Amino acid sequence: MSDLVLVNVPKKRWWKAPFKLLGFLLFTGATAAVMGYGFVYWKYADGLPDIPKVDAYRPPILTEVYTVDGVLAGEFYNERRKVVPYERIPKRLVQAFIAAEDADFFDHFGVDIVGTARAAVKTALKKVSGKGKVQGGSTITQQTAKAVLISAEGYKESTAKTIKRKIREALLARRLESELTKEEILYLYLNNVYLGHHSYGVQSAAENYYRKDVKDLTLAEMALLAGLPQAPSNYSPFTAPEKAKKRRAYVLGQMKEKGMISQAEFDDASKAEVSVYPVEDVFHQFAPYFTEETRRSVVDRYGNKVLLNDGLQVFTTMDSEKQRAAQEAVLWGLLAVDKRQGYRGPLQQLATKAEQDKFIEKSKKVMGDQEIVPGRYYVGLVTQIAKDSLSADITIGGKIVKLPALGMRWAREVNGERYYPSVLINNVKPLKVGDVLVVRAVKDKKGLTDDKEAWSDSLAGELPEGFPLVRLEQEPEPQAAIVSIDPHRQYLSAMVGGYDFDANEFNRVFQACRQPGSSFKPIVYAGAIEKMGWTEGTVLVDSPIVYDDPENQNRWKPANYDEGFKGEVLLKEALVNSMNIPAVKTFIDLARYLGNKNEVIGIKAINDFAHGLGFSTPLNPDYSAALGSSCVYPIELAQVYATINRLGVKKPTYFIRKIEDRFGRMVEDHTAYDDPWASLQDRMASGYARLFEPGEQVLSPETAYLVTDLMRGVVQGGTGAAAQRLGKPAAGKTGTTNDSFDAWFTAFTRDLVTSAWVGYDLNPHPLGRYETGGRAALPIWLAYMMKALEGRAQPEFAPPPSLPLIQRRIDKKTGRLASSGKNSMTLWFKKGTEPEDSEPEKGAADANNFLQVP
């Protein structure tokens, strides 16, 4: 068999083999990559949130609360964010963030493959070994994707250090890049990024750190912000200023290296000093009680989620100047009441020299080199008492100041049953060396006391000019509240619910149901005038009565404040002088009249009458209700007086003027047509709507005017006479309960209705028998009203010409017409009810209606 011969066999080309292998590997790798990507996409892409449309971008943003005159009063948020359009973000700020976070942002497709892979490997190793550091590897697009995931899935799930989370983040980043422009991604990122200091987004950060708008930032300020996203806490300019400065230098260096800024700009920004500020707590600093009541109202109507996330603009009816005046009046008046209670002793007694030295050293560290500033409060230590006991040396930090006896004349032992001026002290003997005190620095001797009754030149001490002086203070124990209403605009202009919101958020204006005392008497007399046809000149009998309650086996014997009796008096005199017995007798007559001699039914009818005026709380089912024994809320008492001011028309009182959503669309609007702070558009729209809300006539205009005139007399010459210092026509009523547990003064001018209350929260003991409404509450009312109405004339309380009212001069004793004389007074009457010449007016003068006491 012959050999096989191969003919024309080509030579092997060995050099092609590597290329074939490479091709095979590339094909296999590509196939694996596609399959792998498909598998990853199938496994992890399910449930990824939709890419947000930029024009429908709705991140959580803060709700802002403003006063009626545009002052920021509070903010509420989960994330403090303000969305700013991309066009308003400075180019340099955009460049700073790109330089710091993602220098190749405009060149990549959304994902840093190497960084993400490295982060995934290290995350896996960390999970297996428990060692190592979890590492990030995110572009700006990936960070934006993470924010979208957090919004859709919640913080915990979307920030978990897992491979799954990183993959989902990368997949979403690719979607973002495919569906949005780079500028749109930056818009989302710069409004979402957390920058510490309660700041989400660059606008919020600009405000929080620098108190500026983002468009006004300097390059140095921009670089500092751009350095924060990686670790806001670590690079905080507050807690780590040196790290923040180094990080800022890094950002500026990156910007220079990338050609974003010149060498000169780099040099200037590197040298620039950047001032940062703490976040202003406007809620607590300005009007916490008012703002908190606003928050509750918004939550009740729209829900907490809307408040915290939807960026409402809430415009309250609060007048910022009136609110400040109210807060100052409450503080000043409450401190005065508390001092009249007496001195409760030092904050602490340091008996040993070692304890005293330790306190002084600590105080030095706190004070540093600060000077003693008049008007400020300090905690000091008594280090020496003068031999004559007329002054004490107080050490504040390392400085010694003088406390003369004049600065603590009020510091007697606590005793509310002794009249204050008679127990003023003339020395500093209540103090001991080692006492830790609250003192207030004063400018000169005149500032040592606000109390004219306590002034004494001899107790001011002889000191060199300019020597630091202080006066003794103490944290007040009683509470106070004030509420002020513009009756015509129906605006709640000012409100203070207590002495210290931080110590107790309980808002006494809305939440404290307190006995109004004699403040309720105008309601009783309004009922008698309205229902029984009584007049200002109706003769009442001020004589002793006893009320027996066989059902409860009680005997009640009301008495006047002065415990005396005046016999026959006119109704106006009875109210002006706040006489108790005529008010009780009027209440009894009214109950018998309305109940057709059935007093139980009659008291229920009076209760209905009071509720019709605006009270929500029930009257006690007995005659003590005449003297204000049934509790009322301060806001409701003020609203009822506002109804009287409006000639008997009841209308709602608003403390929210309007609410707008994040786009400026109106959510609700109660703007008054004559609101000087509102836009013409708001005034016209809301004013037109109010034409169809005329209010409810719950008291005839004639009766309302007569009650106003009665209360005008209280201010002109009765228990509220001190209110004449206002220098403007006012009408109102004092209120004092048994044992002075509550002290009130509620009064109004034509344009402003204000109610002030003073008392203890839990009634541990009374304010003291001399702390009447006229002494404890009226000064707060007056201090507020003098500032609130400064420069504003108030018209007299003249009746409208259309009302059928007439004036007559009446004899004070008989109620008959009188020509002249000191025993007569001019009164208003509804036409047809004025007395005749020859016959005394009849009504409550029949003393036989009541059980007489021998």
Question: Where in the sequence are the language-model features?
Answer:
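Soluble, non-transmembrane domains of envelope/secretory-pathway proteins that act on or interact
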Residues: 1, 10, 280, 351-365, ...
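N-terminal type II signal-anchor transmembrane helix
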Residues: 1-66, 104, 337
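Peptidoglycan glycan-strand catalytic modules in the bacterial/periplasmic cell-wall system
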Residues: 3-7, 12, 29, 60-62, ...
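Active-site SXXK
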Residues: 97-98, 255, 326, 489-490, ...
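Conserved catalytic neighborhood of penicillin-recognizing serine enzymes
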Residues: 125-154, 215, 282-285, 488, ...
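Non-catalytic structural connector segments
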Residues: 132, 262-372, 558-563
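Active-site-proximal helix/loop microenvironment
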Residues: 273-274, 279, 283, 318-319, ...
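Active-site beta-strand/loop architecture of penicillin-binding DD-peptidases
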Residues: 287-306, 480-515, 526-527, 644-645, ...
